[in-house]
Amino acid sequence: MAGIKDIAEAAGVSLSTVSNVINGKRNVGKKTREKVLQLIEEMDYVPNEAGKLLKTKENHTILFVFSDFDRSFYLEVLKGVNDYLKNKDYDLLICTQRSCEKYMRNNMSSGCIVLDAALRDNAILRCANENYPIVALDRTCASPYVRSVIVDNYPAMCEMMQDIIDRGYRRFAFLSGVETSLDNMERYRGFSDTIEKNGLHFHQKNYFVGDYREESGYTVGKILSLAENLPDALICANDNMAIGAIKAFRENNIRVPEDIAVTGFDDIERAQEIGLTTITVPDYERGYLAALYLVEALNGKDVAKTFQISPKVKMRKTVLVKKTKIRSKIVK
């Protein structure tokens, strides 16, 4: 099993830099932080040194379990968590799914914030109890000891889809993320219900399963580029996949939005840079609220079981103002 020294050597950084990343401190550059987090995941690092410290500070340490599907999104949430905790006398420990139960169940942290679609509900339910509250982002769990901060995905997706249909778009493809995640299910439900409401038909051959990563969007973009007839629009369950699909389309001389419109969800920094039509999720605020919820639960306050955040549609340049014609065949 890798140690902190192995991570530092592989990343080409100092031991203190790795320690700062593990503990959620903000004095590390974005690229360096992402590189260290990737190595932590790949090398299955369990922070033993941190674990020894936690045994003496168990009532002042918050665990943050993250997924590496989208680090841009994760970092904004983490900033919100850290900003709330830094003045509350709590330390922050970051870990991945592989080692999280160890820190949840061995008195090595006082509470946990979970942001990992791959972590199963039963793992959360095994650990949550009266003395160990958990706040889950983007999911709900049947336990009085698990609070949730979720995004109201459905109405936002309905609003965006109705706007796109009103602009003349009729034939759609949908690229899902992790199918079992609450976010993905609600985004797809908003997509399909709006299509049905408008009397349109969605062909299941145009339903693709991704994993929220840019690479899966790129793969689907390449597949669609080989099709004889493009759909009018590709609706993606997050921005990373939309960005990957756009890259594949451009490599195959398919114009966005003239030949195919593309949309995302989250409004990460890169989405703003390329003018991606998407739905803005206030990630910083989600992290801040999750930390607030957890600390209040630890202090014995009566906290609502679920807090719902409303996102906003951002129509940008990857969707035409008015769809006037359908491209019938791709010319290579």
Locate the predicted segments by residue.
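Periplasmic-binding protein-like
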Residues: 63, 109-115, 173-175, 207, ...
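Hinge/beta->alpha junction and helix N-cap segments in small-molecule ligand-binding domains
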Residues: 66-76, 96-100, 149-159, 175-220, ...
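Alpha-helical structural signal in soluble globular domains
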Residues: 39, 80-84, 126, 186-198, ...
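N-terminal helix-turn-helix DNA-binding module of bacterial transcription factors
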Residues: 1-58, 73, 189, 323, ...
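Alpha-helical recognition/docking segments in bacterial nutrient-uptake
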Residues: 2, 57-162, 166, 226
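Flexible loop/turn connectors
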Residues: 222-332
